[in-house]
Amino acid sequence: ADKKRGDVPHCTITTIAESPRREGLLWVGTDDGKVWLTKDGGGRWTDLADRFPEEVRRLWVSRVEASHHDEQTAFVSFTGYREDIRSAYVFRTDDGGESWLSIAHDLPAEPVNVVRQHPRNANVLFVGTEMDVHVSIDDGAHWAPLGDGLPRAAAHDLLIHPRHPHLLVGTHGRGIW
């Protein structure tokens, strides 16, 4: 077995996001860097991997997030953690996956575990990295650390409560905040 990769096989689904805007529209990410899209509930799938930069095509897709506001918009984060790549990779599509724009330009050089869009405000995004949570209020153009007493720990999941404006952060070893 490859000592760097271990014995975990590739082609494992790591993340699934169903569009809240359109029935049957699903985004799927895998541990071998592929992002898949179906518009008919799984009848036909399109591999979108070649629409991303070469450098992320072999990385783990850590999260796909279907927009709460537009069926053509989605967000994808990749992590290079298992490859010891300490860069942030977050992308947005506004054309149903035809093209992807990096929105990670001013995030710190840390693997990204999760990206979430606020369900009430399309311009507000959150990312959880290996060390922190960051927020953007301009659709990913600029990012700032969230702060608010959060521990310096890997944020593995984020949830925006649907009825209250609370962000829940699931961390590695530091509980839920």
Residue map of PLM features:
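Beta-propeller blade termini and top-face loops
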Residues: A1-W177
